[in-house]
Amino acid sequence: MVLNYIWIAFFLIAFVVALMRLVFLDDTQVFPEIINSTFSSSKTAFEISLGLTSVLSLWLGIMRIGEQGGVIALFSRLLGPLFSKLFPDIPKGHPVTGSIFMNLAANMLGLDNAATPLGLKAMEGLQELNPKKDTASNPMIMFLVLNTSGLTLIPISIMVYRAQLGAAQPTDIFVPILLATFFSTLAGIVAVSIYQRINLFNRTILFFLGGMSLLVAGIIYFFNTLSRNQIDIYSTTFANVFLFLIIIGFIVAGIRKKINVYDSFVEGAKEGFNTAVRIIPYLVAILVGIGVFRASGAMDYLIDGIDRAVKLCGIDSDFVGALPTALMKPLSGSGARGLMVDAMTTYGPDSFVGRLACIFQGSTDTTFYILAVYFGSVGVVRTRHAVPCGLLADLAGVIAAILICYLFFG
C-alpha cells in the first residue's frame, strides 16, 4: 500500500513540477524529456533483469546447496546460546526456537525465499506463547527488530546489480555492508534490550556482542591505517576470497550430507531464472516512476534542497545524492532497489554516491513491510515498541553506512 502511494506521487509531483517549469520558465523540453525517460527507463529495467538472470542463477544455485547441506542448521547451533538470552520468555527447548534460528540464518545467507516462510512460521509459534493475542510480545519484538536491522553476510543481489551496471569491482561494497549492517543490528538489539530490561552484561551476550564489536573495531582501525589504494586492494581481495570460501564451504557441506550437489545447484539455478523473470514488471514500474520524477527536475530540487541544508550545517554533502535510497528503504524494498539502480545509472556504479546507495540498500531492511506482514499474519495490532526500535536500527545503519563509505571510498 505504501509503495502504491509513493509510485502515484512520483507521477503527480513530476507533472506539477514539469508544468511549473513550462509555465514559469518557458521550458518546452521538459515534457518530451519525461516521455523519453519512460522509454529509456523501461529499456534499462528489462536489460538489467536480463543481465541478472545468469548471476542470480549462479548464486541461488550455490545457496540451494548450502540450504540442503545443513548450513542453516549449523547457524542455529552457533547462535543458540546467544538467542536463549535475548529471548528469555521462550521456554527452553520450545520448537519455535528452531524456526527463529532458521529464519535469521536464512536472512544472513541472503535466502529471502526461505526466510519469509520460516519467519511466518516463527511468528505463529510465538503467538501460541503470547498471553495477549492482539499485542506484540517481547520475543516477537526482538525477533522482528533483528529482521528489520537487515543483518546479512552475503549481499548477493546488490553485487549482482553492480556487476550488471558495469562496476569495475562489484564486490568492493562487501566489507562496508558487513560493517554497516553490524551497527544497525547492534543498535536494534541494544534498543530492544533496554525496553525489555534484558541484561546486556550477561556473560554470553557480552561474549558474542563484545567479541563482534572488537572484531569490527579492529577491521575499521586496520582499514583506517591504509592508503586509499591499499583499502581498495585489501577490501576487494578479502571479499572475493571470503565469497569463494563460502562456495567451497557449501559444496563441502553438501558432500558431507551426501546430497547430489550438482542437482541441488541446478534446482536452485532454475529458481534464479524464474526470479529474474518475475522482477521484470516490478523493476519496470519503479524505474519508470523514478525516471519520470528525475526527468521533471523534481529529484534535482529535492537533492539540492537537502544538499544546501547539509552545507549550512558545515557538513560535507557528497552523501546527499544517495539519501533517497536510505529514505525509501524502510518503506519499500523494491522502491529502494529502484533508487539504488537509479543512483548507479546517474552517477556511475563506482562513484561515491553509487557505492553509498548500495551500502544503504544492504545495511537495513524494509521495516514497515516486515512489521505489517509478520504482525498481520498472526493478528497483532498493538506493536508496542517494535516501530521505534526498528527505526532506530535503520537510523544507526544509515549513519554507519555514511561514515564507513567515507572511510573506504571518500
Spans of model-derived segments:
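Membrane-embedded alpha-helical segments and adjacent helix-loop junctions characteristic
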Residues: 29-128, 257-346
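Hydrophobic alpha-helical segments, principally membrane-spanning helices and signal/leader peptides
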Residues: 36-39, 46, 95-97, 132-140, ...
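Hydrophobic alpha-helical context, especially transmembrane and signal-peptide helices
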Residues: 5, 33, 94, 101, ...
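C-terminal transmembrane helix pair
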Residues: 114-115, 122-161, 167-197, 323-410
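Signature of multi-pass transmembrane helix bundles
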Residues: 1-54, 163-293, 312-313, 385-410
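Generic hydrophobic alpha-helical membrane-segment signal
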Residues: 2, 91, 98-100, 135-140, ...
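Generic signal for short, ordered secondary-structure residues
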Residues: 101, 105, 140, 231-234, ...
